[in-house]
Amino acid sequence: MTLTEGQFQYMVEEMTADLIRLVMENENLSMPNAFDKVYNSCTYKNLLNPLSQLYYQSPGYVYSCLCAEA
């Protein structure tokens, strides 16, 4: 299945929101700090690459990728 640019963007935005929520809950970070952690990560850069297909994975899996960076 091929996604349109709009569909891809929607999936990335939803995954990003889930990641920020997971960072806040699991790492007890404030929202600004969680945003900073997610948006400055290699995982987020990979999420923006359609070829990585991270947007198809579960938020828990992508969060584990984010945790593995540290």
PLM feature spans:
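C-terminal alpha-helical interaction appendages
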Residues: M1-A70
